[in-house]
């Protein structure tokens, strides 16, 4: 099974968000042990760095990004995704982008 993991699922684990960490950790673990083929959007990486840099040292942030990109494949962001997301008229453009990327990779 192939899934595109939302940025917030990654942040739930890294930031230990009490209400979501258990479920998000399961998704992370399934991807880590290759029970699920996990992908993240290229857009997720700078967003994760932006959040983590407020809490962690640059070195720790770099280590976590390396770990994330070893576990999850990164889906590039294409101009077709940008256009398709804009046409979705979603209230959350970032979510619309991720839906377009997921559709493109058949996740």
Q: Language-model segments: which ranges?
A:
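Conserved glycosyltransferase catalytic-site signature
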Residues: 7, 42, 79, 95-99
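Short, well-structured N-terminal submotif of metal-dependent ribonuclease cores
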Residues: 1-40, 53-63
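Acidic, metal-associated active-site segment
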Residues: 93-107
């Amino acid at each position: 099974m192939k899934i595109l993991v939302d940025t917030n699922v990654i942040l739930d684990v890294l930031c230990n968000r009490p209400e979501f960490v258990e479920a998000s950790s399961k998704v992370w673990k399934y991807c880590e042990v290759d029970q699920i083929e996990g992908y993240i959007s290229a857009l997720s990486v700078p967003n994760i760095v932006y959040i983590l840099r407020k809490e962690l040292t640059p070195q720790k942030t770099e280590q976590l990004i390396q770990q994330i990109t070893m576990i999850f494949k990164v889906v590039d962001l294409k101009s077709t995704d940008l256009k398709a997301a804009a046409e979705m008229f979603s209230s959350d453009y970032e979510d619309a982008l991720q839906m377009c990327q997921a559709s493109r990779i058949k996740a």
